[in-house]
Swiss-Prot record:
Belongs to the metallo-dependent hydrolases superfamily. DHOase family. PyrC' subfamily. This is Dihydroorotase-like protein. The gene is pyrC'. GO terms for biological process: purine nucleobase catabolic process; pyrimidine nucleotide biosynthetic process. CDD domains: DHOase_IIa (cd01317). GO terms for molecular function: allantoinase activity; dihydroorotase activity; metal ion binding. It comes from Pseudomonas aeruginosa (strain ATCC 15692 / DSM 22644 / CIP 104116 / JCM 14847 / LMG 12228 / 1C / PRS 101 / PAO1).
Length: 423
């Protein structure tokens, strides 16, 4: 299908393009920005007046819950939710049953994603078999199947020697390793950031050092091995400082933060709502401000939803017995727009952290709005609003933002020139 988008504000952070004009799509690719090519005839025209046309969002962590956790979500439901949030490309972590540590599991997810057709899905493989921290997964075979990176998540390693060997092996094949840096011993049994709020509520604390001790070790091993590394879900000011120092030394490291960490603090836990139970935990206002500044200055390249949908029973229990995680993919763009509304970021910078930045971090063919590129884009109304929860595609409704009126509204999401969401 040929499509013309007329009179939109076209923003491509990768090329610093920011202009009002037209955009033309043919055979799934962008064929012109501005005047239509000779002989071009649009079969469908979208009125872009007052709207922003931007690269489709690239979300680095959307738990699809398939295979194994159908009560929480599946590939179709969660990719549809992501499309509603403006996402066209997403990475799914290996938190499945069985764990995504074999090509067969990766192939299953990719087949289901192609059938759904809502977004481009890039699997992340488990670094060790079953997250056991002892034996490496079939990393090269997983890469050849389509895995773009590897992680052990919040699971530890049997020894630092095994971790070192894993990183050296990954470096040999130019594989990217994703770290969620949290020391398992220091964090064991913890439910909230160690501080006044946790003490007041009587919740076991997770100290900042659970992040920084693991992060310091991981950075040293990255430097020794030369592996490409991405640090996911940073939560603390000190953690940001360590990554910034590593980047200044020229280490091949990137990082992301969860969007909700830029909005919330541990003070949200007062009231014991399990909707705020996340791992790694929400931290202090000072930490939140440091994360925001790092997003602004580019130390943090990517903002991700870290979407973890749950069934109702997983959250309907005493706080300590609930499962951590927030269902966030569906609200990625409107919730992120609060950062623009509050004057923390300008719109091009926000879009860079939601598209080009994450794509670069994991070397994905996404995050660009340019002639010859795939027509993966989002068209949204920056002056509109979204009532969170008025429509909901994810199986998990575990979001503390449901019922909130958020700035911005996704009007169209397109993947390879095909409409995957219209709102």
């Amino acid at each position: 299908m040929t499509i013309s988008i007329r009179g939109a504000r076209v923003i491509d952070p990768a090329s610093d393009l920011d202009q009002v004009g037209d955009l033309h799509i043919e055979a799934g690719k962008i064929v012109a920005i501005g005047a239509a090519p000779a002989g071009f005839s649009a079969q469908k025209t979208l009125d872009g007046a007052g709207l922003v046309a931007a690269p489709g969002l690239v979300d680095l962590s959307v738990a699809l819950r398939e295979p194994g956790y159908g009560r929480k979500g599946n590939v179709e439901s969660e990719t549809r939710a992501a499309a509603a949030g403006g996402t066209t490309s997403l990475c799914c972590p290996p938190y499945t049953r069985p764990v995504l540590d074999t090509p067969a599991v990766a192939e299953l997810i990719l087949d289901r994603a192609r059938e759904a057709g809502n977004a481009k899905v890039y699997p992340i493989g488990a670094l060790t078999r079953g997250f056991g921290g002892e034996q490496l997964s079939e990393l090269v075979a997983l890469r050849d199947t389509g895995c773009v990176a590897f992680t052990n998540g919040l699971h530890g390693f049997a020894s630092n020697r095994i971790l070192r060997r894993a990183l050296e092996y990954a470096a040999t094949f130019d594989l990217t390793v994703i770290f969620t840096s949290q020391d398992t011993d220091l964090a064991e049994g913890g439910l909230a950031h160690e501080g006044p709020t946790a003490s007041f509520l009587g919740l076991a604390g997770i100290p900042e050092t659970a992040e920084t001790v693991a992060l310091a070790r991981n950075l040293l091993l990255v430097e020794q091995s030369g592996v490409r590394a991405h640090f996911s879900q940073l939560t603390s000011a000190r953690g940001i400082e360590l990554v910034a120092q590593a980047q200044a030394r020229g280490l091949p490291v990137t990082c992301d933060v969860a969007l909700y960490q830029l909005i919330l603090t541990d003070e949200a836990l007062v009231g014991f709502s399990s909707l705020y139970h996340v791992q790694p935990p929400l931290r202090t206002r000072a930490d939140r401000e440091a994360l925001r500044e790092a997003v602004k200055n580019g130390v943090v390249q990517a903002i991700a939803s870290h979407h973890q949908p749950h069934e109702a029973d997983a959250k309907n229990a005493p706080f300590a017995a609930t499962e951590p995680g927030i269902s966030g993919a569906e609200l990625l763009l409107p919730l992120a727009m609060t950062l623009v509304q509050d004057g923390l970021l300008d719109l091009p910078t926000l879009l860079a952290r939601l598209s080009h930045g994450p794509a670069q971090a994991l070397r994905l063919p996404a995050g660009r709005l340019a002639v010859g590129q795939a027509a993966d884009l989002v068209l949204f109304d920056p002056q509109g609003s979204t009532l969170a929860g008025e429509s909901w595609y994810s199986k998990g409704q575990n979001s503390p933002f449901v019922g909130h009126c958020l700035p911005g509204r996704v009007r169209y999401t397109l993947v390879d020139g095909h409409l995957t969401h219209e709102g």
